[in-house]
């Protein structure tokens, strides 16, 4: 375990760890949780997936926990307001999709679902066997609880109980699967230490925790959001091209953290890329984008992203071909819409309806600044409508927002 700790420190991705962890000898098992609050994992989850892969490389058996029960509650960590509760059918569907995704990214890994043990736990048993081991004083002292208790929003008993459920998960895995280590982002440290204390109070043995830094920008905001929404790992929600472009657009100062947390490149290569960042940041970002997209979507997904990028950006000053437009739509960089749904509508309304712009206000500003392009020509009039003369090959329209954001409309 000492080798892993040293590597994480050298890489700069060790946030916190339990005393004595470095002396733990392998083989041991470690787990990391994924709550099914959406039908897809997002780019923030990729940090955890890479972390589990890193553990496996050091002889530690990784376990992925899908929170089929805790996903019904919602983790208050890092949240200023309470999550909207999902219904049971949605959580069940999300859980299946998340488990399938984890199995594809982590072949052979043990995947467990806490609904299998928490779902049958009665309220009386929970209060007797779990609740009695926790003291309100220490729970209220946790940062995540303290921040919410004294906020205008407050915290519900439902969210307040999340810490106990996560602690029970750790104890269950410790007892049933000999999982002695729980890992997570830095915002999970309070929950993890509560689980360690719970395991000790029950006399089960010594457990440990290990956390990595959250991936945030210079303002402390989690990386992985854009004006269009979350960056998903499911290619149907975020096509490989969009994932590729997301990393190309990141500020130069953020790419160093990205390559440490979202890739498995060895430390020596990371340090060499750090040096190259000062002289050629765009080349480094392109390389890191290629590494991550290939890791997430495979060689085929990377090829799609590269082909789409070449078609979009090499098309400036030349006509884009029908074959290129078809390939872009098939690679997920397009949207298929019935012709009758859009012909005759204002572009101002269309770009909002398709999610290309977040609001009419944003669309108006882009038009006024000549930053919204239709088939590579700036849209000058916000009252302009889509008519048949604007269709390429009587079917397609190429939308552009500035230099980076592109989309093909397929009026099939």
Swiss-Prot record:
SUPFAM superfamilies according to UniProt: Alpha-L RNA-binding motif, Nucleotidylyl transferase
Reaction(s) catalysed by this chain's protein: tRNA(Tyr) + L-tyrosine + ATP = L-tyrosyl-tRNA(Tyr) + AMP + diphosphate + H(+)
Binding positions (L-tyrosine): 31, 162, 166
EC top class named in words: ligase
Superkingdom in the source lineage: Bacteria
Pfam families: S4, tRNA-synt_1b
Enzyme Commission (EC) number: 6.1.1.1
Sequence motif: 'KMSKS' region, positions: 222-226
GO cellular component terms given for this protein: cytosol
CDD domains the UniProt entry points to: S4 (cd00165), TyrRS_core (cd00805)
Gene Ontology biological-process entries: tyrosyl-tRNA aminoacylation
Record keywords, A-Z: Aminoacyl-tRNA synthetase, ATP-binding, Cytoplasm, Ligase, Nucleotide-binding, Protein biosynthesis, RNA-binding
InterPro entries with a match to the protein in the record: aa-tRNA-synth_Ic, Rossmann-like_a/b/a_fold, S4_RNA-bd, S4_RNA-bd_sf, Tyr-tRNA-ligase, Tyr-tRNA-ligase_bac-type, Tyr-tRNA-ligase_bac_1
Short sequence motif 'HIGH' region: positions: 36-45
Function description: Catalyzes the attachment of tyrosine to tRNA(Tyr) in a two-step reaction: tyrosine is first activated by ATP to form Tyr-AMP and then transferred to the acceptor end of tRNA(Tyr).
Protein name: Tyrosine--tRNA ligase
Source lineage: Bacteria, Pseudomonadati, Chlamydiota, Chlamydiia, Chlamydiales
